[in-house]
C-alpha cells in the first residue's frame, strides 16, 4: 500500500532536514520543555521514520535492482572483497573485546543492574547546566538533555542499566565471533553516539569510527568468523526479489 507514496520520500526528507536545522540553530530553537520544542522534536522523528519506510519500499520500484554506482577500487576491495576480512579482523576483535568487557563489568559490578544507581548519577551529572560564566554544560543538544531528563523523571535507570549491560555484552560477543557483524556494529555505534551526546569522550570517538568501518564492510568484515557461513544462508532479506520473465 505504501508503494504508491514512494515519490514523497524526497520532499519529506527535505522537510525533516529543515526541521533539524531549525532545532539545532541556537537563534531559532525553542527552549526545552516548551510546546514548540515538543512539536518540532516529534515532527522530526515521525518524518524520519516515514522516510525510512518509504525508502525501504522503494526497493520494489522498477529498475531498483539495476542501479549500481561503481566506487573506487580500494573501497570495493575493503568492503566487498573477502581478502579484506583479514584487515577487518583485528578491528573487529578490538571492538568486540572493548564492548564485551564493558558489558561484563556492568553485569558483575554494582550500580547498573542492582537498581541503576551509577547510571542515575551519570545521567544527573550529564543534564546539569552550570551557571553563566562557569563553563559549558556536558550536553550540547537540548533535545538529548530533555530525553535524559525524561528517563530520570520516570526512574528508568533500573531497566535501562540492564539494557546497556546486556547490549554491550551482545555487541561484544557478536563482533568477537563474527556473527552479523554489520548489525552488531550498528548497535555499537548507537551506544557510542549516546555516550558522546551525553558529553563522555574517552575511547568513544575511536570506537565510533571503527564501528562505522565495520558497518560499511559488513559483507566481508565477518568472513573470518561465523558470518562466513551464516550470511550465504541468510542472504539479504531486505533486497527485493528479481522477477525473471518466463521464456515464450
Q: What name fits each language-model region?
A:
Residues 1-167, 177-248:
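Extended, low-polarity transmembrane helix blocks
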Residues 170-174:
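Transmembrane-helix motifs of polytopic, lipid-linked glycan transferases
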Amino acid at each position: 500500500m505504501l508503494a504508491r507514496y514512494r515519490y514523497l520520500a524526497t520532499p519529506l526528507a527535505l522537510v525533516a532536514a529543515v526541521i533539524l536545522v531549525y532545532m539545532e540553530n541556537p537563534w531559532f530553537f525553542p527552549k526545552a520543555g516548551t510546546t514548540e520544542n515538543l512539536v518540532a522534536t516529534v515532527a522530526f522523528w515521525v518524518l524520519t521514520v516515514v522516510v525510512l519506510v518509504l525508502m525501504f519500499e522503494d526497493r520494489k520500484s522498477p529498475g531498483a535492482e539495476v542501479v549500481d554506482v561503481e566506487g573506487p577500487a580500494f573501497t570495493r576491495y575493503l568492503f566487498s572483497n573477502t581478502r579484506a576480512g583479514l584487515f577487518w579482523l583485528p578491528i573487529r576483535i578490538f571492538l568486540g573485546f572493548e564492548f564485551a568487557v564493558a558489558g561484563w563489568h556492568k553485569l558483575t559490578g554494582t550500580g547498573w543492574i542492582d537498581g541503576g544507581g551509577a547510571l542515575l548519577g551519570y545521567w544527573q551529572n550529564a543534564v546539569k547546566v552550570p551557571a553563566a560564566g562557569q563553563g559549558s554544560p556536558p550536553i550540547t543538544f537540548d533535545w538529548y538533555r530533555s530525553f535524559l531528563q525524561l528517563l530520570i523523571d520516570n526512574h528508568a535507570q533500573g531497566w535501562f542499566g540492564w539494557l546497556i549491560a546486556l547490549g554491550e555484552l551482545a555487541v561484544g560477543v557478536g563482533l568477537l565471533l563474527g556473527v552479523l557483524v554489520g548489525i552488531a556494529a550498528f548497535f555499537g555505534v548507537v551506544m557510542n553516539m549516546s555516550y558522546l551526546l551525553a558529553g563522555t569522550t574517552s575511547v568513544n570517538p575511536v570506537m565510533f569510527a571503527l564501528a562505522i568501518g565495520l558497518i560499511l564492510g559488513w559483507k566481508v568484515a565477518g568472513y573470518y568468523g561465523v558470518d562466513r557461513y551464516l550470511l550465504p544462508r541468510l542472504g539479504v532479506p531486505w533486497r527485493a526479489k528479481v522477477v525473471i520473465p518466463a521464456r515464450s
